[in-house]
Design a protein with these regions (language model features):
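N-terminal glycine-/serine-/threonine-rich beta1-alpha1-beta2 phosphate-ribose binding loop
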Residues: 1-138, 150-165
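Immediate post-signal peptide segment of exported/extracytoplasmic ligand-binding proteins
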Residues: 36-40, 188, 192-193
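Glycine-/small-residue-rich active-site loops that bind phosphorylated ligands and cofactors
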Residues: 51, 124, 146-147, 173-174, ...
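Alpha-helical packing segments of well-folded alpha/beta enzyme cores
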Residues: 56, 81, 85, 128, ...
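General small-molecule cofactor/ligand-binding pocket signal
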Residues: 72, 99-101, 167, 279, ...
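Short basic (Lys/Arg) and small-residue
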Residues: 143
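Rossmann-fold dehydrogenase core element
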Residues: 154-172, 181, 191-196
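Contiguous beta-strand/loop segments that form the cofactor/metal-binding neighborhood of enzyme cores
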Residues: 180, 192, 197-201, 206-456, ...
Length: 513
């Protein structure tokens, strides 16, 4: 039991008296100041997923002993995953039996839970984050933070109304190697960014599919109404529950799962909080297996000073994001270009490739512009390996890894400390960025400081995500109304406000070829 538990109970009795979430948060913050950094922090697990099992749990354990954190409870609405999760945690190094909760209301009745890790389906992250901070808990929330602006505004408002420490799972912001590259990119040495090319190509018929797990899910074993979490009512569908990444409004698929991390990196490196405009095209071109989310996407972003509008020239640049699940040629690339050369983020190198040569500069009486080569990480080093999460590196080899999928715990008797394996057969495990991001959150929980990947970073990547989804759903160029914090169709002036499509028949994948 956490030291100071009796005091915490007295603070949290406010919840049973029906006190508003802000008052509860104020009481919890008072407790945090009294307890101090040396008191053990009890952590609740919200959602026993593959992302938690394969990456977050082992990453957490890297720092938990030193920083005095421990798992004390687990909440999952599906009885199978709840029981499997309890068994999994008990087999972790230093593990023990944790309290099991059927839902988050039960979880937050447990006074030993002082913070939570949320690793549930995409569309639940924001609302469950709101629940956490209103219950006076600190939270680590997996990416994406939100895929509707309504949810994004709700979690941002909730966090800003408290002093809860909330970190988002865009883990690159805590990685030393990415931080060094960020510092270089913001130093001015690279020159003005003119273009970014982001690519993610795989060929995986089983990507985000879970037919065996789907067959094990029965409505009586879960709480379908809670699963929907504010989405429109619809009949129970085990496939949408387990394979949610393939179906809007539970996920947009490629943008939710893959694009967010890279767009967050662009925004972090450049300081721009959001795109000025987004257009997108794509469809379901090959994997016609009942999914509604696209298997192929191209999205084009215009970035630059917001007050200059869509045609502003100063320091503006274009980002082209392409992804396909149908052919892996081209693999994964993140290339940043200036007039003087390029940053290959996957390799951690800056080269004068494509920069203005002496010959071409002389023609217009200009000076050559050739970047000085830099290698941020020695080839074969741990830092070189860090430039890309383990799941991404595994995909380059075999195209066989899945992230943040509904979890299947090891069979009884399986050693939890062994390397974890995804349902498609590849080792994943914690990457150094995730270890660093969780540690940063844990340290900030103790020190009551803002984490590297904070609520503003999460909100901003959610804006870019929602703009992309709107472009997919409408086929039009979209922008953003800063005054109303809404995605709009057309330019910021003379626009039409976008109405988020969330019914079962009005889907981003509806424009199938």
């Amino acid at each position: 039991m956490a030291r100071g538990g009796a005091s915490r109970r007295s603070f949290l009795k406010l919840a049973g008296a029906g006190v508003a979430g802000t008052a509860l948060s104020a009481a919890a913050s008072s407790y945090a100041r009294i307890a101090g950094a040396n008191d053990r922090v009890g952590v609740g697990i919200v959602g026993f997923s593959d992302r938690f099992r394969n990456s977050l749990a082992p990453a957490f354990l890297k720092s938990a002993g030193e920083l005095n954190f421990e798992f004390v409870a687990l909440s999952d609405i599906w009885s199978k995953r709840r029981d499997d999760g309890g068994a999994f945690v008990s087999k972790l190094p230093g593990g023990k039996q944790v309290a099991l909760a059927r839902n988050n209301e039960e979880l937050y009745e447990n006074k030993d839970v002082q913070a939570v890790i949320i690793a549930t389906p995409d569309f639940q992250h924001a609302s469950q984050g709101v629940e956490a901070v209103r219950a006076g808990r600190d939270a680590y929330i997996e990416k994406p933070l939100a895929n509707t602006m309504e949810d994004a505004r709700a979690i941002r408002t909730a966090v800003k109304g408290t002093d809860r420490v909330v970190a988002i799972g865009t883990q690159r912001r805590s990685s030393p190697i990415y931080q060094r590259i960020h510092d270089y990119m913001t130093s001015g040495t690279f020159g003005d960014l003119v273009s970014v090319e982001l690519t993610w190509n795989v060929n995986q018929p089983g990507r985000w599919r879970r037919p065996k797990l789907v067959s094990q899910l029965h409505e009586a074993d879960t709480d379908w109404k809670r699963f929907l979490t504010g989405r429109p009512p619809e009949p129970f569908d085990p496939r949408k529950y387990v394979e949610f990444r393939l179906f809007w409004p539970f996920s947009s698929g490629i943008p939710d799962q893959w694009m967010v991390q890279r767009i967050d990196t662009v925004q972090w490196f450049t300081g721009f909080p959001r795109p000025r405009s987004v257009v997108a095209n794509g469809g379901i071109y090959h994997w016609r297996d009942g999914r509604k989310n696209w298997d192929t996407l191209t999205a084009v972003f215009d970035y630059g000073p917001i007050d200059e509008g869509l045609t502003g020239a100063a320091k503006g640049f274009q980002v082209v994001y392409t992804a396909r699940m149908t052919n892996s040629a081209g693999g994964m690339r993140e290339h940043y270009f200036s007039n003087g050369g390029m940053l290959d983020l996957e390799k951690g190198t800056v080269l004068p490739t494509g920069g203005l040569t002496e010959e071409n500069a002389r023609e217009m009486e200009l000076k050559a512009n050739q970047l000085t080569p830099i290698t941020f990480a020695a080839p074969g080093s741990e830092e070189a390996a860090e430039l890309g999460a383990p799941a991404e590196r595994s995909e380059r080899k075999s195209g066989a890894v899945t992230e943040r999928s509904p979890a299947q715990a090891p069979a009884s008797g399986t050693a939890a400390a062994a390397p974890t394996v995804s349902p498609l057969g590849e080792n994943t495990g914690p990457d150094e960025s995730t270890i660093a991001n969780l540690r940063n959150w844990m340290e900030c929980v103790q020190a009551r400081k803002r984490p590297n990947s904070d609520i503003e970073a999460g909100y901003n990547h959610s804006v870019a995500l929602c703009m992309t989804i709107a472009a997919m759903q409408t086929g039009q160029r979209v922008s953003f109304d800063d005054a109303k914090q809404e995605v709009v169709i057309g330019p910021p002036t003379g626009h039409v406000h976008f109405q988020q499509r969330s019914s079962r028949t009005d889907l981003p994948g509806g424009r199938e070829p």
